[in-house]
Design a protein with these regions (language model features):
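Stable alpha-helical elements in mature extracytoplasmic
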Residues: 11-15, 54-57, 93-97, 144, ...
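Functional beta-strand-loop-alpha-helix junction segments that form "active/interaction loops"
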Residues: 1-25
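Caspase-like cysteine protease fold
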Residues: 111-152
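Short, basic, glycine/proline-bearing loop/turn elements
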Residues: 1-5, 85, 153-155
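Low-complexity, Pro/Thr/Ser/Gly/Ala-rich linker/spacer regions in secreted
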Residues: 68-70, 149-156
Length: 169
């Protein structure tokens, strides 16, 4: 299922609302522009400086419904979040951001420490930094990755068109 965030609304809140309506989510793939220790989610830039202010939302992303939380229900594997965005895990601050996001969501996280996207622009599709074991494959086929002609770079730049990549999922 593909969910496109409204660019005029808080993206962290939108993701929380979306995940609250679903159960047994194994993985969430987030396609966004990024920078070191920062990710654009809808109309919100989530970063190391403001992540604590979103704690209440982030902690609900994979929370069990009350009935399941009070039963013998258990999840055998941690959920996973794959962050497709340039340089999100670059620098010590970037790694700290990814680790804190993992702690708050309870998910294993995979993120990139370099450009994500077209090899012709110096990018790749490897998510080099992880906070745990990531078993989920990339969301995009090899053909879609090769066809994408941009990178998911700095939040202040427009580099690449998401439409071709989103349509390829």
């Amino acid at each position: 299922e593909i969910v496109i965030l409204n660019a005029d609304r808080d993206g962290i809140e939108q993701i929380a609302e979306t995940l609250k309506q679903r159960q047994n989510i194994a993985a969430v793939h987030i396609l966004s522009h990024g920078a070191a220790a920062s990710l654009q989610l809808g109309g919100t830039e989530l970063n190391l400086s403001n992540i604590e202010s979103y704690r209440n939302y982030l902690e609900t992303w994979f929370a069990l419904p009350a009935a399941e939380a009070n039963s013998n229900y258990s999840i055998t594997a941690k959920p996973e979040i794959l962050l497709y965005g340039c340089n999100v895990a670059a620098t010590e601050a970037g790694v700290a951001f990814v680790e804190r996001l993992s702690q708050l969501t309870g998910a294993n996280i995979a993120a990139s420490d370099n450009l994500t996207g077209s090899a012709a622009l110096g990018g790749d599709w490897e998510l080099e930094v992880t906070t745990g074991n990531i078993e989920t494959p990339l969301a995009f086929s090899a053909e879609a990755r090769e066809a994408y002609n941009g990178v998911l770079a700095d939040l202040n730049q427009t580099t690449g068109d998401f439409n071709g990549l989103v349509n390829a999922i």
